[in-house]
Amino acid sequence: MLGRSRLALVLLAAAVSCAVAQHAPPWTEDCRKSTYPPSGPTYRGPAPWYTINLDLPPYKRWHELMVDKAPMLKVIVNSLKNMVNTFVPSGKVMQIVDEKLPGLLGNFPGPFEEEMKGIAAVTDIPLGEIISYNIFYEFFTLCTSIVAEDKKGHLIHGRNMDFGVFLGWNINNDTWVITEELKPLTVNLDFQRNNKTVFKASSFAGYVGMLTGFKPGLFSLTLNERFSVNGGYLGILEWILGKKDAMWIGFLTRTVLENSTSYEEAKNILTKTKILAPAYFILGGNQSGEGCVITRDRKESLDVYELDAKQGRWYVVQTNYDRWKNPFFLDDRRTPAKMCLNRTTQENISFENMYDVLSTKPVLNKLTVFTTLIDVTKDQFETYMRDCPDPCIGW
């Protein structure tokens, strides 16, 4: 067994290697060009479209989708169970999840509880495990989101969904287990009422909150995790203990997409609503200057950083670190994203080269499940599953 000093040296060497890799080829690369329309080894394929009929009872809304995706959902749920059982081999944790979790968490707001019950029934997966599957998006979402404004005042919103860090590494093909298992679950969703689109979103089958979406002609919205000592674990503990005056962040995002009727209304709700976990809300509108990053603590807004093209701020970039702080030295996606945007210039920013920026390592990395591009005014919403072949950084 390694002595403490030798172990410390090994860990230090590993950290230094990762830090260097963040800023050196082949782990990074010059800004990609001409990657759109998507093709080649970093492109897994387009996300399929499904319609969610909001006129149906919540229990039945996800039936068609979950009939198709139940086998893939069972795979990822079993992987999560196996990881838990690795640390607690007795199986007691999963027994508590299956038997006690629904009662501990109590009633969820709005339609969400009935929707999860419907998903559990269709997939034959215990409700506690479906709830756990919905909860864990509050903790493991590492993403890059960008809103950019061109010289004509036109807005483009892009995001990489990075998910699955530390949730199992496959040594046979150098990939994150959960990241790979999420790709077959990636879907585009058209939420309709009276046969008309209310909003569109990209998500994972089985998850009833939303992390990425837009309301055609009005606004676009993405959600990134924010690391904080006063984090989501405390929010969930408060919820279990009966203090339920805060919203689950994925449920809030979906509620805003479904009900808000303007950029300003969405911004106001996202800024003021109490939430269970700290988060970044990246919001884009339909006219010049309507783009911002809302940095949220659980109880209040800490910062609203807005586009201001007249002052040279024609884009906002958000990863998983407060903009006024340096990113973690092992995980700097902000710097290469900004570098590629600056090289692109406001004169040339477009749907196509937004995809270029999001395809450049390490903005694209082993955790990247999908890339979404949004043009609110043109009603464009495209989601593509991604791969990052070696050499590629783990996050």
From Swiss-Prot:
Top enzyme class: hydrolase
Main location class: other
Reaction equation(s) it catalyzes: an N-acylsphing-4-enine + H2O = sphing-4-enine + a fatty acid; N-dodecanoylsphing-4-enine + H2O = dodecanoate + sphing-4-enine; N-tetradecanoylsphing-4-enine + H2O = tetradecanoate + sphing-4-enine; N-hexadecanoylsphing-4-enine + H2O = sphing-4-enine + hexadecanoate
Subcellular compartments: Lysosome; Secreted
GO cellular component labels: extracellular space; lysosome; membrane
Glycosyltransferase recorded as keyword: no
Gene: ASAH1
Name used for this protein in its record: Acid ceramidase
Natural source organism: Macaca fascicularis (Crab-eating macaque)
Known role: Lysosomal ceramidase that hydrolyzes sphingolipid ceramides into sphingosine and free fatty acids at acidic pH. Ceramides, sphingosine, and its phosphorylated form sphingosine-1-phosphate are bioactive lipids that mediate cellular signaling pathways regulating several biological processes including cell proliferation, apoptosis and differentiation. Has a higher catalytic efficiency towards C12-ceramides versus other ceramides. Also catalyzes the reverse reaction allowing the synthesis of ceramides from fatty acids and sphingosine.
Highest taxon, organism lineage: Eukaryota
Active site positions: C143
Pfam families found in the cross-reference section: CBAH, NAAA-beta
One BP annotation, GO: regulation of steroid biosynthetic process
InterPro entries: Acid_ceramidase-like, Acid_ceramidase_N, CBAH/NAAA_C
Enzyme nomenclature, EC number: 3.5.1.23, 3.5.1.-
Annotated site residue numbers, Important for catalytic activity: D162, N320, R333
Signal peptide: 1-21
